[in-house]
Amino acid sequence: GNDNTSATPEVLVAIGELATSIGAADITEIEFVSTAFDKSDGGNIDMLVRFNEPVTVTGTPQFLVTNNTSSSRNVTCDYLSGSGTNELTFRKVTAAGNAATNASDVLKVVANPVSLNSGTIKDTGSNTASTITSSVAIGTAAGTLTVAA
């Protein structure tokens, strides 16, 4: 026990929130919403990013998807939704026949794909969430997206 009778009572109340205030939210999982994309039809390239606790987003953070074929055709997905939850969605809308991808391109996730882009991603304790993937395995587990003609 603590014999300090002058301890501030508010400290005891704050202990209930301690778990969410000690460390920043971390990315725990990343995945493609679909694993195939038809260039002739166009459509959305969506990424799901899961954190170990709910996060709040301001602005438009971005997610970089690399193109195995050519870095000049990497895809940048903008934040779409999920603030207040532990799952954020990033999206790139691609018009039919768009030159950003070619048939047989393989899109994949590499280390540290999230950039704040002048926005913020914060946990419930107001800590800036980590945008660093804690392991290359997180990106590898996301799989790939193959572009069709």
Model-derived regions: residue spans:
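Non-catalytic beta-sheet/beta-sandwich ligand-binding modules that flank or precede catalytic cores
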Residues: 1-149
